[in-house]
UniProtKB/Swiss-Prot annotation:
Residues 1-54 form the TRAM domain. It catalyses: uridine(1939) in 23S rRNA + S-adenosyl-L-methionine = 5-methyluridine(1939) in 23S rRNA + S-adenosyl-L-homocysteine + H(+). It holds the Pfam family TRAM. Keywords: 4Fe-4S, Iron, Iron-sulfur, Metal-binding, Methyltransferase, rRNA processing, S-adenosyl-L-methionine, Transferase. PROSITE patterns: SAM_MT_RNA_M5U (PS51687), TRAM (PS50926), TRMA_1 (PS01230). S-adenosyl-L-methionine binds at Q264, F293, N298, E314, N341, D362. The active site is at C389 (nucleophile). The lineage of its organism: Bacteria, Pseudomonadati, Pseudomonadota, Betaproteobacteria, Nitrosomonadales. [4Fe-4S] cluster binds at C67, C73, C76, C155. One of its GO terms (molecular function) is 4 iron, 4 sulfur cluster binding. It comes from Thiobacillus denitrificans (strain ATCC 25259 / T1). Catalyzes the formation of 5-methyl-uridine at position 1939 (m5U1939) in 23S rRNA. This is 23S rRNA (uracil(1939)-C(5))-methyltransferase RlmD. HAMAP family: 23SrRNA_methyltr_RlmD. Belongs to the class I-like SAM-binding methyltransferase superfamily. RNA M5U methyltransferase family. RlmD subfamily.
Length: 432
């Protein structure tokens, strides 16, 4: 007989947390305040992992998942929780990490940045596999806790134009002679363009190429092919096509990019996040500002648009070349860019860059610990805006900024970049 537990809270991955015979048990599919019948699928020394078999007393915040693949597909984990409650849970994750890891609390909690809950995702990496037992080729995300690919024909969080391609892609690849040599497809949607980058372990033959060209024409998409690393990606069809781009209309900017270059998956939240970052940073003419981990200039160019002299630093040579091109195309001579490995920052290297009035930091999940440890004791930037995709590393870096470098955590809040997932995007303001 399956045990019944009361769900006490949600963990940072969106699992229900219960106690069973004194042992912490993480319950997939259960919400705080619910009573659930569970089935344990893995026992560890200090905790159990379980699935909710039946919800005996549902939470008022429980929602009916919109996606028919929810529960099997691993792309989403929180569709069963009402959207506003998802955001509240992410805000709690941010606050708990700041308090527990960073030993800091923000003076102000910023209101969460919201956007569309469905059809928001313009970027995805779709796995491909021929599975005859499932009727042919599968294209989509992996199943939950599995290397298998979910049997899906659409996706509710992908942009509608991208979601509508999943079933046609399954049919296309099923007709190709090298279907077993296409492990994945990278999808990138701009404001008016969709690009599909096929990862190819062997090239298409003439018949395959004809099928792919016909598919691209019929579905109004561009097809690229990638033989090895991302740098090998190149256009396949059509020969002449408009470039990918996204806009930051508040600043009058158009940002072209290659499909293999990093951009945020959620364009609406990206616009809101850039707007908030600029309000918090408040760049002014004559100020000298650094944008670290600048990518293709997502924050750098809006800062330059406000008249500040801004130096963007990024470890990728390709992204810096793109950022320089974007600055030129948007007529922003106040934006300069350099290539440097910010994970190897030292106080000496930071001092050589010259003094900065303000700093914007937007690192990957690993954070920016070497940068914050390298800030000078005297003459440090008086204001830092930190954009984070991992609250744990933000909290770790905040501890150094506040307790070692003398900054105050003035404000922090979340941006719901990935609705229906446990991913927490956040932004924080530090001042001294």
């Amino acid at each position: 007989m399956n045990p019944v537990v009361d769900i006490l809270s949600l963990d940072h991955e969106g699992h229900g947390v219960a106690r069973l015979d004194g042992k912490v048990t993480f319950v997939d599919g259960a919400l705080a305040g619910e009573r659930a019948e569970i089935a344990i699928f893995r026992k560890h020394a200090k905790y159990n992992s379980a699935n909710a078999v039946a919800i005996l007393a549902p939470s008022a915040q429980r929602a009916e998942p919109r996606c028919r693949y929810f529960g099997r597909c691993g792309g989403c984990s929180m569709q069963h929780l009402e959207p506003s409650a998802q955001v509240a849970a992410k805000q709690r994750v941010l606050e708990e990490n700041l308090a527990r890891i960073g030993k800091v609390r923000p003076s102000v909690l910023l209101p969460a940045l919201h956007g569309p809950s469905w059809g928001y995702r313009g970027r995805a990496r779709l796995s491909v596999r021929r599975v005859e037992k499932k009727g042919g080729v599968l294209v989509g995300f992996h199943e939950k806790r599995s290397s298998f690919i979910a049997d899906m024909a659409s996706c509710e969080v992908l942009a509608p134009g991208v979601s509508a391609l999943i079933q046609p892609l399954r049919e296309l690849i099923g007709r190709l002679s090298n279907a077993d040599r296409i492990p994945q497809i990278e999808v990138a949607a701009g404001e008016h363009v969709i690009v599909l980058v096929f990862r190819l372990l062997e090239p298409w033959n003439d018949d395959d190429a004809a099928h792919v060209r016909a598919f691209a024409d019929a579905h109004h998409v561009q097809v690229w092919e990638q033989r090895k690393g991302p740098e090998t990606a190149r256009p396949f069809w059509p020969d002449i096509a408009p470039e990918l781009s996204y806009g930051l209309p508040e600043f009058g900017l158009v940002m072209p990019f290659r499909p293999t270059e990093f951009t945020q998956v959620n364009s609406a939240i990206n616009r809101a996040l850039v707007s908030r970052a600029l309000r918090l940073l408040d760049p002014r003419p004559g100020e000298r500002i650094a944008d670290l981990f600048c990518g293709l200039g997502n924050f750098t160019l809006p800062i330059a648009h406000r008249g500040a002299d801004v130096l963007g630093i990024e470890g990728s040579t390709e992204l810096v070349a793109r950022a320089r091109e974007n600055a030129l195309r948007n007529a922003l001579p106040h934006a300069r860019f350099e290539v440097d490995n910010l994970f190897e920052m030292t106080p000496e290297k930071f001092a050589a860059l010259g003094p900065f009035d303000k700093l914007l930091i937007d690192p990957p999940r690993s954070g920016a610990i070497e940068v914050v440890k390298s800030l000078p004791e005297a003459g440090a930037p008086r204001r830092i805006v930190y954009v984070s995709c991992d609250p744990a590393t933000l909290a770790r870096d905040a501890e150094v900024l506040v307790h070692v470098k003398g900054y105050r955590l003035e404000a922090a809040g979340v941006a719901n970049m990935f609705p229906h997932t446990a991913h927490v995007e956040s932004i924080a303001l530090f001042e001294r």
